[in-house]
Amino acid sequence: KEPVTENTKKVARCFYALEQDRADKKRYPAVNPIDSYSKYIEYPEFEEYIKGHINDEWIGKVNELKTRLQRGKEIAEQINILGDDGVPVEYHVIFWKSELIDFVILQQDAFDEIDAVTPMERQEDILNMIIDICHTEFDFDNFNEVMDYFKKMINVCKQMNYSKFKSEQYEGFQKQLKELIAERSVNS
C-alpha cells in the first residue's frame, strides 16, 4: 500500500482509486469501483436531493451494484485459484453479472459522442435494466455457456450505450436484449 494514498483516504470524503491493472485491461476510466468511494452518499442532504431529483431507490441500487462487484471480484479470485471447473456454474453466473455491471455501467468511451455524456434519465434506465438482469435467474449447464452468453449480452448492452437514448436503434437493441434474456431465463 502506498503511504500518500493511504493517508489521503483517511481525510478525503471522495476518493477515486486509479488502478494500473484496469488501465492495462483497457477498462476506462481506470478507476477501481470497489476501492473508490464517496462519503457524500451517506449524507442526509445528499439522500434528500437524490430522492427529490432522481429516485427514492437510487442509493440502494448503487449500493447493491457495489456489493455485486465485490462478490464478483471474490469469485474471480476463486476461479483463478481453483480453475473454471473448480467452482460451481452459479459462481460463474455471479462473476459474469459483475462483469456486466463493469462493462455496461462503469466503463465509458470518452471518444464516443453519446457514451461520453450520459444524461441522468439514461443512467437510470440502464441501471434499472442491469439490476433486472442481475435479479434474473438463468439456467446453464457449464461455465462456457455462461461466458459465451454474457459476452453476447455485454455486446448488445454496449451497442445500446452507443445509440441515442430512446431512438429506434436503442429500442432495437433493447428488444434484442429482452429476447436474449428470455433464451436462458428460468422464469420465461
Region spans (language model):
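C-terminal accessory/interaction regions of large nucleic acid-associated machines
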Residues: 172, 176-188
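P-loop NTPase catalytic core
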Residues: 1-158, 166-169, 174-177
